[in-house]
Every structure is written in C-alpha cells, then in structure tokens.
From Swiss-Prot:
Pathway: One-carbon metabolism; tetrahydrofolate interconversion; Amino-acid biosynthesis; glycine biosynthesis; glycine from L-serine: step 1/1. CDD domains: SHMT. It comes from the Bacteria. It comes from Cyanothece sp. (strain PCC 7425 / ATCC 29141). This is Serine hydroxymethyltransferase. Its EC number is 2.1.2.1.
Amino acid sequence: MTRTNLDFLTETDPAIAGLLQQELQRQQDHLELIASENFTSAAVLAAQGSVLTNKYAEGLPGKRYYGGCEYIDKVEQLAIDRAKDLFQAAHANVQPHSGAQANFAVFLALLQPGDTIMGMDLSHGGHLTHGSPVNVSGKWFRVVHYGVDPVTEQLDYEKIRQLAHQHRPKLIICGYSAYPRIIQFDQFRAIADEVGAYLLADMAHIAGLVATGHHPSPIPVCDVVTTTTHKTLRGPRGGLILTRDPELGKKLDKAVFPGNQGGPLEHVIAAKAVAFGEALRPEFKTYSAQVIKNAQALSQQLQQRGFKIVSNGTDNHLLLVDLRSIGMTGKLADQLVSEVNITANKNTVPFDPESPFVTSGLRLGSAAMTTRGMGTPEFIEIANIIADRLLNPEDLAIVQECRQRVAQLCDRFPLYPHLSRVPVLS
C-alpha cells in the first residue's frame, strides 16, 4: 500500500496530523462559499508537499546565487512558460509569495513614497493593498479612493475619470475583492492615458475566468497585472505578476528579488506550474463557465426568496447579499449559516452604515463547490438552505433540517476521498 505524507506525519507528530485530519473533514463536510477559496487538485497538493521545499534558489532560472538549481530552474521555467501561455503575456514572474507581495513589488518598481495612487474604496469592494490606511499602500502613498454608483452599485467610469483628472495619480488600480460585475479594462486604460498614469489590474478574484475567456483580459491594455494563484485559478496559495512589456518585466523582477523577497518557494512554484497546466486544458474552460452559471443561479434564487443582491446580480464567481433587506447584519448571518455547516464571510456593502467588524452584507462565491462537481440545481438548493436559515434564525428544527440538507449535498460530491482513510486522532 502506498503511504501518504499524512501517514508519515501521523507517526512523527500525531497532534498536527490529527488537526490536519480534522481540517480535512471540515472541508469535506461543509459547503465552502467563501469567494476567495477553492480546492486544489491532488496533483497540486503533491507538488507543494514535495522535496522542492528543501532547496534555496535566490535569483531567476539560469541566474541563481546557489548551486544545485538545475532541476529547480526547469520547474520554475515551466511555471513561467505556462503562465505566459495561459494569459498571453510577454513576461511572467511566478515568485511572489502572495497577491499582496505581488502588488507591493509593483509599487516598488513604479512608485516613490508620496506618489498618488487611485484604487477602489475597501468598503465598496476594493482590497487592503489598494490604499487602505491600515496597509503599507495607504501609509506610503497619497491615496484617492473611488467607489460605485449609489443607484446601480456598479463602477461609474465618468466619475473615476473626473477623480483622475482632479488628482493626477501616478498609478490607477483596477480589480477588486468584492465586485460582482465585468470590469471594463479598456475604459480604465483610456482614463490612465489621459492623465499619464500607470495602470495596474489586480485580477486575483477573476484570474481563472480571464484565463478561459469568461472575463475580458487586462493583459492587452494594462501596464502590469497581478493575481493570486488560488481562488478561481484553483492553484496553490501564491502570487503572480504579468506584463505585456518585457522591459518593464525586468524592472518588476528586480522589485520581487532582491526588492522585497529573498528565496522563492520552489515547492509552491511547482504547484503553480501544475495548476497552470491544468488551467490550459479544455475541461478547465468548462469549469469556469459553470462557476459563473452557479453564481448566477445562487443570486437569482436568493432574489426569488426576497434578498437584495448588490448590483442586482453577478457576472462572475461572487455575489454580495445586502442583508438590510431583512434587517440583519453580516456578522449575524455569517454565524447563522456557519451553524448549518456553510462557510461564508460577512462583508461590507456599498455605503454600508455598519462597521467592517459587523457589516450589512454576506459575500458568497461559487468556485469551490463547483470544483466538487455541483451544478445549478445544487446551487439553487444551497440558496434555499441559506434563505431558510436566515429567515428563521430562532427555529432549531430548521437548523437540524438545514444541516441534513448540507450533509446530503456534501456526501453526493465528495472531496479528496483518497485522503479519508486516516483516522482522526484525539
């Protein structure tokens, strides 16, 4: 019988092995609706848990500061080539440890402290690294935030243009953590050109949709594109920088190393290469299309049950439920769905009167459960489970019924069954 990494871990450190097994069971037994999460393939898990974790490899393929990198170079070059092929980019750096590290490398390459940047307000769907005052991006740079239209709850490109002309930013950031609609990257390009700004697209949430043509690509029009490699791309947790400009790519490489990182995580880079290879296959395009269909089914059914959806729907993998329509906070809704084994997250909605610790919204995503094989009928049922729970917060019978319905869905669409034979350790 082939032994797994978990077998070895069980012998050496049963405490950690037991916790890993409990986390595995949590993932198997819950409906994962956090929009930024997904499930990697077993092949990605295998690459990340490989002997490549033993090797230091500062530098780039063919230009290392350590010996013994002949195979590491081939692994990283494969990741680079596959990323370029997947996104039709002229240059790729696969070394950023995260999306935040990728963004910071771009700032280091293009900006000086005190420069002006423009990004979406966090409460409207932006990200911490786009100028939030609690992040280094908000401390080192002068930040101008834009938001969505109060009526449509979608980007107001004319208002963004006016802000850009008023403040003349050095860098404009587009791409978000909680925006459910198509981003018109060409309109951002026109605005950036009018004011002489660099244009950065952070496509962390939609990278898998971009790769398969289900969302317009920022590569042809943006100066730099960053992304995480998990979320809709379904790879390991990590970052990636892409550009259509090879000369700018050299500058970005230096901003990653030695600019803000040391040794790259080559075991993670190998896992990225595997994920990029998977994303190049026809079945991944089918998967991405289903991700959108499932999110739209979830959104439409929740609307049928009386919930308000921010921007009245979704074009991608995520949706925001505005809980003010039922007089509930995001914090409470998060707690209520958690009690029936549904994992989601409270989230601010545009013009939210509540604090970020309470919020008026619930963010939901379809990527992870689509990976498990669920389709639109299952997502309609998920919407009904959520609605039944939130509309009956005090009904204990509903709690038990919803848990059973969640369990039935999870049993029909198993996750990592090959890992399930290891017993839970006390």
